[in-house]
């Protein structure tokens, strides 16, 4: 038996003298590298049909490289890391990582992170409002009996899109330029370029091509339908065009753009992910101060620990 620090290593021989190893933790304190972990499904009442996010709850001591490497390993659209807040108003601080980079804000990971913080014992200062600290500032998350909803942050970039870029977006979506009835920069962190088509049917028919853009597309369902709009989101990862199942940040910035232009009237329900086998449902509302809220159902599908 060899003891190295706080790890005990037992060298064990079976009856045939074959060597095996038994690693035992001498003290519970060794969990300095063992951290609570959960994988949350966001924006669907049906588990495994929304958009997953991996959440590491105890992240003191992790550096940027360790967070990025773990996010690369999970290979989900986002992995989040919860930390003590630096702002006294906030309940916790979160960092968002894709497999290749850190983001200043992300929508469904905000709701997943808030839910993880709650199920692992977090108690908000205000009973029904959680305050999240992230790179874009403080994000308020409301909870009721069935939904978590975040307050859409201000756009980092808005306004009209150059015609050459609109043409590039049409090529990336495999559609005619004339099919795009409007477009705008609607960046609240990930870099979204918003594209509006005439109908949900047209949105569902998109067959995306290779792109260097981060594209969000929306089209309306016929009046009286359960959903008001269909949304799809596309971005490039490693040179491959990827479709995001259900996207909170995009639905937030889409709402700010199109409600602000007087074309959409909240509240409304968005469908997303249908083409790729998901069943995302995004609840969009606006309060009396004209603050846009993005909500959905949230489910914890995996809980345990990870070692980082």
PLM regions: where:
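N-terminal amphipathic/hydrophobic targeting modules at extreme N-termini
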Residues: 7, 19-20
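Hydrophobic alpha-helical signal peptides and transmembrane signal-/tail-anchor segments
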Residues: 2, 6-14
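Aromatic (phenylalanine/tyrosine) cluster motif
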Residues: 11-13, 21-23, 27
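Active-site proximal loop and beta-alpha junction motif in alpha/beta enzyme cores
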Residues: 27-105, 111-308
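Generic short amphipathic/hydrophobic targeting helices enriched at N-termini
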Residues: 3-5, 26-29
């Amino acid at each position: 038996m060899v003891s190295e620090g706080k790890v005990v290593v037992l060298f064990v021989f079976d009856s045939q003298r074959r060597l095996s190893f038994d690693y035992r933790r001498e003290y519970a304190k060794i969990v300095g590298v063992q951290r609570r972990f959960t994988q949350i499904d966001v924006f669907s009442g049906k588990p495994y049909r929304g958009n997953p996010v991996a959440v590491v709850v105890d992240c003191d001591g992790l550096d940027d490289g360790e967070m990025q490497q773990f996010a690369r390993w999970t290979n989900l659209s986002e992995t989040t890391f919860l930390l003590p807040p630096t702002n006294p108003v906030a309940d916790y601080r979160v960092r968002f990582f894709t497999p290749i980079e850190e983001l200043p804000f992300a929508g469904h990971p905000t709701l997943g992170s808030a839910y993880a913080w709650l199920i692992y014992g977090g108690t908000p200062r205000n009973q029904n409002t959680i305050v999240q600290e992230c790179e874009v500032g403080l994000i308020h998350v409301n909870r009721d009996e069935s939904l978590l909803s975040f307050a859409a942050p201000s756009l980092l970039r808005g306004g009209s899109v150059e015609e050459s870029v609109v043409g590039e977006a049409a090529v990336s979506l495999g559609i005619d330029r004339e099919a795009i009835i409007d477009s705008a920069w609607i960046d609240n962190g990930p870099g979204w370029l918003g594209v509006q088509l005439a109908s949900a049917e047209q949105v569902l028919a998109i067959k995306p091509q290779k792109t260097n853009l981060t594209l969000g597309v929306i089209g309306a369902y016929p009046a009286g339908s359960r959903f008001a709009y269909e949304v799809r989101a596309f971005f490039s990862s490693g040179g491959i065009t990827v479709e995001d199942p259900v996207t909170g940040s995009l639905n937030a910035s889409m709402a700010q753009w199109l409600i602000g232009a007087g074309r959409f009237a909240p509240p409304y329900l968005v469908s997303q992910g249908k083409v790729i086998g998901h069943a995302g449902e995004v609840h969009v509302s606006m309060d009396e101060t004209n603050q846009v809220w993005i909500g959905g159902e949230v489910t914890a599908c995996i809980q345990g620990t990870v070692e980082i």
